[in-house]
């Protein structure tokens, strides 16, 4: 089976792709998985570390051909506010819940979640459900190959929490 072991960032490659894979946000965070392109090309994605594949990236096959990465449309909520301070407050609350957030100019985008949508309405946010590719920020550790930082909160969901509840003291940044 053909193997893809390297990623070429968007804009760094110009030759035609041999095939295309269309993946949602979760499916683009991979290290090793068998994939099939839309034209039927089977290959093994076999990266050294798990990383976030971005829309427009390409993975390079052992034989030199490229497979283009396309971000699939997803059910999202686009968030706007009457002023920047309210939008910043909302961004803080979303970050405190460790939710991936896409910054789109003066709008925020998150994956649709009815509980989070209800919370945002309480902050006087304007919400619009859309179908679009989801390209959230990589986070403070994205440059080092990680998309999320490690620390233990014990068992919890991504709901409301404070870091005072953490199993061990820790700091961000």
From Swiss-Prot:
Alphabetical UniProt keywords: Chaperone, Cytoplasm, Nickel
Region of interest (Disordered), ranges: 136-173
Gene3D superfamilies to which the protein is assigned, alphabetical: Urease metallochaperone UreE, N-terminal domain (2.60.260.20), UreE, C-terminal domain (3.30.70.790)
InterPro entries listed in its UniProt record: UreE, UreE_C_dom, UreE_N, UreE_N_sf
Compartments where found: Cytoplasm
Domain of life, per lineage: Bacteria
Protein's GO biological process: protein folding; protein-containing complex assembly; urea metabolic process
Chain ranges passing through the membrane: none
A Pfam short name: UreE_N
GO molecular function: nickel cation binding; unfolded protein binding
Residue ranges, compositional bias (Basic and acidic residues): 146-173
Main location: cytoplasm
One annotated Gene Ontology cellular component of this protein: cytoplasm
Family as reported in the entry's similarity comment: Belongs to the UreE family.
Functional description taken from the UniProt entry: Involved in urease metallocenter assembly. Binds nickel. Probably functions as a nickel donor during metallocenter assembly.
Annotated protein name in UniProt: Urease accessory protein UreE
Organism: Beijerinckia indica subsp. indica (strain ATCC 9039 / DSM 1715 / NCIMB 8712)
Gene from which the chain derives: ureE
């Amino acid at each position: 089976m053909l193997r893809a072991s390297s990623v070429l960032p968007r804009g760094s490659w110009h030759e035609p792709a041999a095939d295309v894979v269309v993946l949602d946000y979760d499916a683009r965070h991979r290290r090793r998985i068998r994939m099939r392109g839309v034209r039927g090309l089977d290959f093994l994605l076999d990266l050294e570390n798990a990383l976030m594949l971005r829309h427009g990236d390409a993975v390079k096959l052992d034989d030199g051909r490229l497979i283009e990465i396309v971000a699939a449309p997803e059910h999202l909520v686009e968030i706007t506010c009457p002023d920047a301070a309210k939008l910043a407050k909302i961004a803080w609350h979303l970050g405190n819940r460790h939710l991936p957030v896409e910054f789109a100019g003066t709008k925020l985008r998150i994956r649709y979640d009815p509980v989070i949508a209800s919370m945002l309405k309480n902050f006087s946010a304007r919400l619009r459900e859309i179908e679009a590719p989801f390209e959230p920020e990589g986070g403070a550790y994205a440059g080092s190959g990680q998309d999320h930082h490690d620390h233990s909160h014990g068992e919890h969901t991504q709901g409301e929490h404070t870091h005072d509840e953490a199993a061990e003291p820790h700091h961000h940044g």
